[in-house]
Amino acid sequence: MHDVDFIKRNPELFDYAMQNRNYEKVAQKIIELDIKKKQLLTQLYSLQKERNQITREIEKLKKDGVKCDTQIESSKNITEKINDINNMIKEDSQLIDLLNVLPNVPDDIVPVGKDESSNVEIRKHGYKRNFDFQVKTHYELGEKLNLMDFKQAAKLSGSRFVILKNQLAQLDRALANFMLDIHTKEFGYSEISHPILVHESAMYGVGQLPKFADDSFKTTENFRLVPTSEVALTNLVSGMNINSCDLPIRLTACSPCFRLEAGSAGKDTRGMMRQHQFNKVELVSIVTEEQSASELERMVQVAEEVLKRLELPYRVMMLCTGDMGFSASITYDIEVWVPSQNRYREISSCSNCKDFQARRMNTKYTTITNNVKVSKFAHTLNGSALAIGRTIIAILENYQNMDGSITIPLALRKYMNDQEFIK
């Protein structure tokens, strides 16, 4: 949600920001709708004041034993007008409807561009392995070892699902524990276990609704299956006013995530790269405005640390204005090297949403400024650290051996009963 006062003060800047995010100019329309709403509110307050005066007059006349039929009739007429204006305000949702579908304003340092071709590489880490044999895909390796079954999954649920067996099922669990241990024991995140069914209001709070209603699974009673733990974790502070001394709040969770992948027809149709259901470890931070920028850098470092421990080559990209998510003001993607595709693929996305989500959730913090207590909207950040399915892909492909076995990364072996190989 946007600050209308900011738009009124900076209409050209706001339009420039929206155009950079591939949206049309809307500042003038927002200003006009806001003026219309305020005119109605002014009329409403004036009528309420007039009715209160007449009410006091009626009470005095009754006390004095004087007839007050004229005043009573006037009060009824004013009440009807008040009801009419209240109905007009309720029905006139154009301003809110428009604000609900406009993305966040990009940070000043975000590169301008229409799509991923304008994303900027920040740094690389690790070395790509030179194979002396023909590299296999993760699904070729998994199916050959009889540890990955797409056919049986399709019988159960359709396309874009997978069944992991034995050592790969164990690897899936091991990765979750490995990541959560890093986040909680070394970086101070609090682990949360949360529902995977949420109210639509929670989806609205983080910006998933109303614009992306077709991207998530809807159940009866207006529940949604979470597309990411970000939804649940961020909404834990919905409606709260937090003491600034209690910030930052850092939360982490591993949960199944569910996505319709409505716009992904023909993309990554084989394997685990793009699934309707997958496990992911998520990081969420609730911070003050002053903590916001440094918290994003810290979050990216936490996600990078997982890949460093697994000794997987990766790069960090800053997304351009046209490629960022709806609620993000600035986003860093971490992309891991996938040998069979000879390219980097996204494995983590870390975003600073600034006060965009907090305005939708009405989440504030209290601070002292010039000896005066002030409430401000909190800043929220989220990041995947990491998507477990894609981490499995990266391990299988980067650690594959000529005989089709997979060497288990050293950092994971204590989570895998000290096994050295998947075979």
From Swiss-Prot:
Pathway: Aminoacyl-tRNA biosynthesis; selenocysteinyl-tRNA(Sec) biosynthesis; L-seryl-tRNA(Sec) from L-serine and tRNA(Sec): step 1/1. It is found in: Cytoplasm. It catalyses: tRNA(Ser) + L-serine + ATP = L-seryl-tRNA(Ser) + AMP + diphosphate + H(+); tRNA(Sec) + L-serine + ATP = L-seryl-tRNA(Sec) + AMP + diphosphate + H(+). One of its GO terms (biological process) is seryl-tRNA aminoacylation. GO terms for molecular function: ATP binding; serine-tRNA ligase activity. The keyword Aminoacyl-tRNA synthetase applies. Its main location: cytoplasm. SUPFAM superfamilies: Class II aaRS and biotin synthetases, tRNA-binding arm. Keywords: Aminoacyl-tRNA synthetase, ATP-binding, Cytoplasm, Ligase, Nucleotide-binding, Protein biosynthesis. Its EC number is 6.1.1.11. One of its GO terms (cellular component) is cytoplasm. InterPro entries: aa-tRNA-synt_IIb, aa-tRNA-synth_II, aa-tRNA-synth_II/BPL/LPL, Ser-tRNA-ligase_type_1, Ser-tRNA-synth_1_N, SerRS_1_N_sf, SerRS_core, tRNA-bd_arm. ATP binds at residues 259-261, 346-349. Pfam families: Seryl_tRNA_N, tRNA-synt_2b. Catalyzes the attachment of serine to tRNA(Ser). Is also able to aminoacylate tRNA(Sec) with serine, to form the misacylated tRNA L-seryl-tRNA(Sec), which will be further converted into selenocysteinyl-tRNA(Sec). HAMAP family: Ser_tRNA_synth_type1. This is Serine--tRNA ligase.
